[in-house]
């Protein structure tokens, strides 16, 4: 590949075959990373964004069987917890007082969770934060929506419409892991299928709920699975335009059952992490304009590298992020806005606070 020429004409995009070849190409690593950085500069300039937000993982009780998850516990476990809607509202109020523009609300699949309970959570957050001007609610993965809708006897569109009416603004595109049913059969057997994930995300877009998109890699997948996953996301975005960002998530292996049982590798290498950012940018161009580094999973220094290899967003302040922590992430769960700005300035970027839709707030 002529990398300089491609950086100038990235709108032509690359084929699946070329994409796979880039992942397998170790000789041209720095050309790949540099090409992605050039494309990102053309699209986003020197701006590196971040969001002031709070994660609220409202329960770790889950009937799921995801083999990568160290967060879930059974109902009667000593460490089991469930934060009721009123308390979630209080947490959202605290977040708003501290300057957050977004709360991200997700939890395990507890048997009592239905659309009514999810709606009550949304209503409590809206009510609690209304005196302060409200807060953006980014909540409930496609799997959570599927689970709650089935418990309520509703179809997906009906469930999403009810959630939207009660205050849901956007939805995390999590529960994607790797969008390949053979991989999912080993990794998360009872989780929604690739087809179901796509349907729920597209339906959300069609009813006016934008989503993020994610990919968890570094476990049992091969490069071909990553490539297919990226193309699925690209095709969704070309059809709906409803994806706000792409967030690659490096597998946290230390406490993951599938790893300590000897059935998965110990996460990705730093080189693989940078390749994922770079090749995603080369493929997506400005179709999915925003690519986020996960500082909780990568650590600060590798996250900074990712921002020079095609990514343009540092993510959020988070305040609490229990899922990565449970799986063995050791880079903290909170970073203040000033510290984030310093991290971005240190690599010559221009830090800008954004909202969930990537509108600049300063």
Swiss-Prot record:
The keyword Magnesium does not apply. InterPro entries: Aldolase_TIM (IPR013785), CofH/MnqC-like_C (IPR045567), CofH_family (IPR019940), Elp3/MiaA/NifB-like_rSAM (IPR006638), F420 (IPR034405), FO_synthase_su2 (IPR020050), rSAM (IPR007197). GO terms for molecular function: 4 iron, 4 sulfur cluster binding; 5-amino-6-(D-ribitylamino)uracil--L-tyrosine 4-hydroxyphenyl transferase activity; 7,8-didemethyl-8-hydroxy-5-deazariboflavin synthase activity; iron ion binding. Gene3D superfamilies: Aldolase class I. Residues 48-294 form the Radical SAM core domain. It catalyses: 5-amino-6-(D-ribitylamino)uracil + L-tyrosine + S-adenosyl-L-methionine = 5-amino-5-(4-hydroxybenzyl)-6-(D-ribitylimino)-5,6-dihydrouracil + 2-iminoacetate + 5'-deoxyadenosine + L-methionine + H(+). Pathway: Cofactor biosynthesis; coenzyme F0 biosynthesis. Consists of two subunits, CofG and CofH. Catalyzes the radical-mediated synthesis of 5-amino-5-(4-hydroxybenzyl)-6-(D-ribitylimino)-5,6-dihydrouracil from 5-amino-6-(D-ribitylamino)uracil and L-tyrosine. NCBIfam families: CofH family radical SAM protein (TIGR00423), F420_cofH (TIGR03551), PRK07360.1 (NF005609). This is 5-amino-6-(D-ribitylamino)uracil--L-tyrosine 4-hydroxyphenyl transferase. The gene is cofH.
């Amino acid at each position: 590949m002529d990398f300089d020429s491609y950086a100038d004409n990235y709108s032509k995009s690359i084929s699946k075959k070329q994409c796979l070849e880039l992942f397998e190409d170790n000789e041209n690593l720095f050309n790949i990373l540099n090409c992605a950085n050039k494309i990102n500069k053309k699209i986003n300039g020197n701006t590196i964004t971040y969001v002031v937000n709070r994660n609220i993982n409202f329960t770790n009780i889950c009937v799921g069987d995801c083999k990568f998850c160290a967060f879930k516990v059974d109902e009667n476990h000593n460490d089991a917890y469930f934060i009721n809607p009123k308390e979630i509202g209080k947490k959202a109020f605290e977040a708003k007082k501290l300057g957050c523009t977004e709360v991200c609300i997700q939890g395990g699949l507890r048997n009592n969770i239905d659309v009514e309970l999810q709606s009550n959570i949304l209503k409590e957050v809206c009510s609690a934060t209304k005196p302060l001007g409200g807060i953006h609610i980014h909540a409930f993965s496609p799997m959570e929506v599927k689970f709650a809708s089935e418990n309520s006897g509703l179809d997906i569109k009906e469930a999403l419409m009810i959630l939207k009416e009660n205050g849901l603004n956007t939805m995390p595109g999590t529960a994607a892991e790797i969008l390949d049913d053979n991989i999912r059969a080993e990794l998360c057997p009872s989780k929604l299928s690739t087809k179901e994930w796509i349907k729920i995300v597209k339906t959300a877009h069609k009813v006016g709920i934008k989503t993020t998109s994610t990919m968890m890699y570094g476990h049992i997948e091969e490069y071909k699975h990553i490539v297919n996953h990226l193309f699925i996301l690209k095709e969704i975005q070309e059809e709906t335009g409803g994806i706000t960002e792409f967030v690659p998530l490096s597998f946290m292996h230390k406490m993951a059952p599938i790893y300590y049982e000897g059935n998965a590798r110990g996460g990705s290498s730093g080189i693989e992490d940078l390749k994922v950012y770079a090749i995603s940018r080369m493929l997506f161009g400005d179709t999915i304009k925003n690519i986020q580094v996960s500082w909780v999973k990568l650590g600060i220094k590798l996250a900074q590298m990712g921002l020079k290899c095609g990514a343009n967003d540092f993510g959020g302040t988070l305040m609490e992020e229990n899922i990565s922590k449970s799986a063995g992430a050791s880079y903290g769960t909170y970073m203040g806005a000033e510290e984030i700005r310093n991290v971005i300035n240190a690599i010559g970027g221009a830090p800008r606070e954004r909202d969930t839709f990537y509108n600049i707030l300063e």
